[in-house]
Amino acid sequence: MGIVKGRSRAGLFIGFLFIVNVGFCVFAQESSNEERKIYVVHLGVRRHDDSELVSESHQRMLESVFESAEAARESIVYNYHHGFSGFAARLTDSQAKQLSDRPDVFSVAPNRKVELQSTRIYDYLGLSPSFPSGVLHESNMGSDLVIGFLDSGVWPESPAYNDEGLEPIPKHWKGKCVAGEDFDPAKHCNKKLVGAKYFTDGFDENNSGISEEDFMSPRGYRGHGTMVSSIAASSFVPNVSYGGLAPGVMRGAAPKARIAMYKIVWDRALLMSSTATMVKAFDEAINDGVDVLSISLASAAPFRPIDSITGDLELGSFHAVMKGIPVIAGASNTGPEAYTVANVFPWMLTVAATNIDRTFYADMTFGNNITIIGQAQYTGKEVSAGLVYIEHYKTDTSGMLGKVVLTFVKEDWEMASALATTTINKAAGLIVARSGDYQSDIVYNQPFIYVDYEVGAKILRYIRSSSSPTIKISTGKTLVGRPIATQVCGFSSRGPNGLSPAILKPDIAAPGVTILGATSQAYPDSFGGYFLGTGTSYATPVVAGLVVLLKALHPDWSPAALKSAIMTTAWKTDPSGEPIFAEGEPRKLADPFDYGAGLVNAERAKDPGLVYDMNIDDYIHYFCATGYNDTSITIITGKPTKCSSPLPSILDLNYPAITIPDLEEEVTVTRTVTNVGPVDSVYRAVVEPPRGVEIVVEPETLVFCSNTKKLGFKVRVSSSHKSNTGFFFGSFTWTDGTRNVTIPLSVRIRVLNP
């Protein structure tokens, strides 16, 4: 548990830690009997522009709890002295407590682990290089921007990093590539891969979190970092597929953007990082000059109750946003249960995962000459074998050898368990029947086919009607377009926001199922250096790449303005106009807690008309509304702060969504919009109220001109419900007849005294 001061309410941040230094001395003796472990200490905004002076102040602070200057110096793991001030050090629990007791200290918390969570994607999203007036060409494909990744490293030989035809490296870039095992900057970096660093000091002294297979360099064994960077910003690579599946030209969302990798993920099996290492990478990325940060990492969910600020990812991202760097992060992969969404803070752009209009299948031809298709990502040769039904696949294994096995399961984990069991017992293949409209994402080198219960029952009837049932399974094939329905994936974590329910999370959805990307050629599941990845990890770089394009078009927009443009222009249906569903039990129409504002639409986002902008004063509003005292807020923001009395309402944060988790009586919510479209514009309000909720907008019309670029409005919310309810959903739009600026409305009724 972290040690935090100046807190009057239960926790805001998960997973980060920090402190502040103003030169106050507390003399203490180091306890030689206590175990030392890494603590991350955040000191808020830098007191000096000179990074050496900042580091010296860290040294002096540590000397106050150590017996000698040398011992203090040896305890330091990382100095954070570029984008913000802080350090990671090996401390005893009592030393951490002594630091936290200082009047100039904000918080201290122990180092933790943090988990990681294309040939069709961008055509599906309408982002085509063949459109001369589209956002791709208008932004020069992101050529002048650098996108940073905090991930597992790169495989630099991948064609995704080809720099042919790229212009010189942007002048604002100050980063570099660092040499290491099998990584030579002169050979492996170029005008595409412009930065590559690795960080190991945040692990324990014997580096127990680092796999022996990995490289002590920016080179990544696992390939996750190569995947996410290629999804966001791969150069054009023709004739790519995964063993014949998903064939086409691979490209990132921003094909000319430059890539900087900060390797912080080392555990090959669990794909984890440490918080101390992550904070150091944030600090370096800010100083290097990245323009956008993509982070496929999240704290574990569901969230435990917390009474301290321990938000490494959250506070690192806050400092980045304060420097004008948008931070895009995944919602996590613990859905479809409610309250599982991660990365829930208002300065982050949090991404849920959907499928796209592409699936992979195999033909199953049975001995009665009936052919049925099932989902499969099998890339091997055609298989002919006997067919057997096994109800209890864990214990009844004697009949599996050389046969294709049919079994029925209820849960996701059972699919993997059945696959492992049939593989060990040398079955020729596996057909799994499962309830619901589930999209399989398992890539395997033997026939593995998913069907629903209805199809499974047909296959079972054939088996029982035949004395010697047989099956022939084709190699996998690719199907694009109708009739594949767009849906939010079952694994994609769901809202509401468990820490600040009035802040909608996730914010946006993007494709994250069977996404083709480049990977490490050392990785066993790689097929010629490519892989089909599934998870919010892969939806995140889709949005990050699109943000690069928007920032290239609008370099003066703040991260909040870019986020607003993404959210207010999102599709509420799929690109063909069909409804978006949400996987789960039962399957349902998607709502804002599944997909945020909707499915990302970059072409509309380039010209949103109006934006809900935020700056440091808005974030101070958020901190005050959630219970932080003036001293704590001043430390973390660097701006002298005195919260109003009574405290401001979190409902009035200028967020591009209105979420009211506990409507007891009529409430009025305020928002401000900034005109980024034609100077002389008139917008009128259009409301689709949640069921049983009355919405009144004042004024109903907004008139902008050269002297009026920002206008405020009020939304009065009341309900006719007489009892407690769940959430009801609607939307609110400002429209000028061409541009529709839409935000989600989410309201839950709480009648405390019926």
Swiss-Prot record:
Belongs to the peptidase S8 family. Residues 121-606 form the Peptidase S8 domain. Keywords: Autocatalytic cleavage, Glycoprotein, Hydrolase, Protease, Secreted, Serine protease, Signal, Zymogen. GO terms for cellular component: extracellular region. Glycans are attached at residues 206, 239, 369, 629, 740. It comes from Arabidopsis thaliana. SUPFAM superfamilies: Subtilisin-like. GO terms for biological process: proteolysis. This is Subtilisin-like protease SBT3.12. It is an enzyme of class 3 (hydrolase). It is found in: Secreted. It holds the Pfam family fn3_6. Residues 29-117 form a propeptide.
